[in-house]
């Protein structure tokens, strides 16, 4: 998808005459963060390189190591001023969607995690809206984005993006 993102960032989205909302979760939000940079194709290229060449100290990395490597990838992709650039530009209004576990879904590993995710799967089959019993939706949003799209029927907490929460929000969106 990196080649498509380069075309989107350098060609198609550069013609936008009004602000564009970039709403997503997981790796999509990482790509949106790159598209929001002054030189989006270069940021996408850095993300691709960081992703392809990520390294771990062991063959079975701990969750902490995975989190640390993900943070390094994001910092490499965005560059030295990328966080400030994303927050200060007004062309793209990022909305980073995350889910905060509650109740039985708060298990971190093993049987508690399996029980929580199995419960979530069963509730999702019955009704997607019932997932609100197990998760809170948190949308980390650009300061200029007043309303988060596609949240009807879901309890969504809006949090303004800032320099301290951008990287953690991107990681949380990917469940890292």
Model-derived regions, located:
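Patatin-like phospholipase
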Residues: 1-21, 34-176
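Catalytic nucleophile serine of serine hydrolases
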Residues: 26
């Amino acid at each position: 998808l990196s080649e498509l993102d380069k075309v989107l960032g350098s060609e198609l989205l550069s013609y936008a005459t009004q602000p564009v909302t970039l709403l997503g979760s997981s790796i999509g939000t990482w790509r949106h963060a790159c598209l929001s940079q002054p030189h989006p194709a270069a940021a996408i290229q850095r993300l691709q390189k960081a992703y392809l060449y990520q390294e771990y100290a062991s063959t079975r990395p701990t969750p902490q190591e995975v989190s640390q490597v993900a943070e390094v990838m994001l910092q490499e992709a965005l560059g030295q001023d990328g966080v400030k650039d994303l927050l200060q530009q007004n062309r793209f209004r990022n909305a980073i969607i995350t889910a905060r576990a509650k109740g039985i879904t708060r298990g971190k590993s093993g049987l508690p995690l399996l029980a929580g995710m199995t419960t979530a799967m069963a509730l999702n089959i019955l009704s997607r809206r019932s997932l609100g019993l197990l998760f809170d939706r948190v949308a980390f949003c650009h300061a200029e984005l007043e309303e988060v799209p596609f949240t009807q029927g879901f309890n969504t907490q809006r949090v303004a993006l800032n320099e301290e929460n951008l990287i953690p929000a991107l990681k949380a969106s990917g469940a890292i």
